[in-house]
C-alpha cells in the first residue's frame, strides 16, 4: 500500500509479511495514497493495574488486561508502566496480541513516602539494591518516588541527593534506566543532577532546568491534566494539603503546558503520558491535545505520543524488518488532531485489530 508517513511527510510503499514490515520504500509522487500512517500511539506513563475498567476487586492480571484492551482499542500499541503495586503487567511483555509493554517493576519509596499499599518500601541504604533488582526483573526500568508529603503536608524529597544519585548510577551500570517521580523544586533538581532518564510530572521544572536536562538526556513526562490546576488542587485539598502549598501547586500546574512547550523548543525530550491509574485509562489523545494547546506544534505533539516516544523507549518505527505496528488515518492529524479519534485501521504485529466501516484494502497478510 502507498501511504504518507505523518512524521516526515514522505510517501512510502509498505508491504507486510509474517507480522513485520517486509518492505518500506520511498514512493514516487504519482498515484493515490491509502492514507496517513504512524507507528501506533504510545503512552509512557500508564499504570495498568490501577483504575482498571475491570474494577478494583478484580485480580491483578484481569485488571491489567482490561486496561490494556481499552488502550489498544484507541490505538495505543506501546506503553511504559513506570511503577506498579504488583508485577502483573510483566506477563504482557512480549505476549502477542497486546501493546508492547515496558514495565518498571514496583514503585520504590521509603516507609511512609508514598500512598499506602502501593510501593515497595525500602530505606535509603537499600535503595540502590532495590532499584537494581526492579530494573533487572522488569522491562529494564526502575521507578523511584522522589518526593512526597511530610508530616506537615508539605512536599519534601524522600532521599538525600547522594542516595538518589547512587541508586540511579547503580541501575545505569547494569544497563537499565530510571524514572523519577518529582514534584517539588528540590526533588526535581536532585533528579536532574542524578541524571535520571525521565522525570515524571515535574511540577517544579522551569526554564532554568532545560540546559541541564538536555545535556543529561533527561526526558520530561508532564502528565498534563484536563482541567489543569483546578483538578489537581481539588484532589490535593482532599488530602489536607495546606493553603500555601495548594497555591504553589495551582501556579506550578497551571504553567506546565506552556513550560513544556518551551522545554520542547529548547531541545528537551517531552513525552506524552496520561498517568492512567491516577485517573481513567484511554486518555492519550487528550494528552496530545493538551501538549498542542500549550504551544508544542501539533505534529511534534503527536510524535510525543508516537514515534518520539517509541524511539525513546527503544522500539522501532515504520522500517523494514520491524514489527508491523501502525495506524492508518484518512487524513493528516497534524492538520486536525480530531482525526486521531477516527482511525481507519489499527494494525498490531501485522494483524488488523480495528477497521473503519469502509476500510481501504491494505494488503496486510493475516
Identify the residue ranges that each predicted region occupies.
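N-terminal metal-binding scaffold of metallo-dependent hydrolase/deaminase domains
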Residues: 1-30, 37, 327, 331-336, ...
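C-terminal cap of metal-dependent C-N hydrolases
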Residues: 3, 302-308, 320-366
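Divalent metal-coordination and catalytic microenvironments
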Residues: 19, 34, 42-45, 75, ...
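Divalent-metal coordination cores built from histidine and acidic residues
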Residues: 44, 51, 60-176, 216-229
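Active-site core of metal-dependent hydrolases
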Residues: 154-257, 265-266, 271, 276-278, ...
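His/Asp/Glu-enriched, well-ordered alpha-helical/loop segment
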Residues: 173, 253-332
